[in-house]
Amino acid sequence: MSAKILDGKALAGRLQAEMAAQVQAWLPRVGRPPGLAVLRVGEDPASAAYVRGKERACERVGIASFGRHFSAQDSPAHLLDAIAQLNQDERVDGILVQLPLPPGWDPIPPLLAIDPAKDVDGLHPLNLGRLVRGEPGLRSCTPLGVMRLLQAEGIPIAGRKAVVVGRSLLVGKPLSLMLLAADATVTVAHSRTPNLAEVTRSADIVVMAVGRPRLLTADMVKPGAVVVDVGINRIQDPDGSEQLVGDVDYEAVKERAAAITPVPGGVGPMTVTMLLANTLESYKLRSHL
């Protein structure tokens, strides 16, 4: 029997419709729409596509965009100057630096320069520290999207064994803390983990976030597990065409798991939607709603 498909695209659409209605209700009280500034450096096509997707999502919800684009040959000081200006701009509730930055650009200074109250990517040390301490704060978008998707689908987390494969600051580390806060028993696996299949087979919930195409095969999943695929990989088919796949061997694993996210259409739309949610949260706090 095939797994239940965890449709992040459908949930994202419903949540964005709710957000659009909220924005319209708040506008008369605040006198301005929420504002998001996405800062992009360089000409990477994937980054440009991601930024366009975020701007389209903002338009659907009613969030004003204050994005800026910098050349890879530009001075990093110009990016820091722009962040300083946006920190003071009352029209802007959220600031995001699109990662990765081009070679030679250190991502740490711009991430540290963002006002934590406008850090809608949840990567400032203050917001990460709040996550560790279990305090309210802006959370990383992809892990937050995973949690919202699991909760919306009614998947139990408390008391379950969860394995997160990947230890990045963007996904693996914050997601493991969010699962722990939801009372899961959490194991974090990575490239140096011996007997990875043995670890993943013990899990009720498996989250893949390593960027390796189809790494998780059916024999690595126990029957009835929930599988969340955060990976996005472009591979070339024998005919030369490109295909977008996750870190999970989807067709095989869906016959063994109880529930699974597709790629595309699973976690990706939820990541963008949580960026909007974080922007609205900052807007609410700054507007005293």
Curated annotation (Swiss-Prot):
Identify the EC number(s): 1.5.1.5, 3.5.4.9
Q: Does the keyword Lipid metabolism apply?
A: no
Which residue spans traverse the membrane? none
The Gene Ontology biological process terms listed for this entry are: L-histidine biosynthetic process; methionine biosynthetic process; purine nucleotide biosynthetic process; tetrahydrofolate interconversion
Protein origin, superkingdom = Bacteria
GO MF, one term, reads: methenyltetrahydrofolate cyclohydrolase activity
**Keyword Cytoplasm carried by entry:** no
CDD domains listed in its UniProt record? NAD_bind_m-THF_DH_Cyclohyd (cd01080)
What GO CC annotations are associated with the protein?
cytosol
Q: Which PANTHER family match?
A: C-1-TETRAHYDROFOLATE SYNTHASE, CYTOPLASMIC, C-1-TETRAHYDROFOLATE SYNTHASE, CYTOPLASMIC-RELATED
Q: How does it assemble?
A: Homodimer.
Q: Which HAMAP family match?
A: THF_DHG_CYH
Family to which the UniProt record says this protein belongs: Belongs to the tetrahydrofolate dehydrogenase/cyclohydrolase family.
Kindly provide the name given to this protein in its UniProt entry. Bifunctional protein FolD
Naturally occurring in which organism (per UniProt): Synechococcus sp. (strain JA-3-3Ab)
Q: What is the lineage of its organism?
A: Bacteria, Bacillati, Cyanobacteriota, Cyanophyceae, Synechococcales
The gene name on file is folD
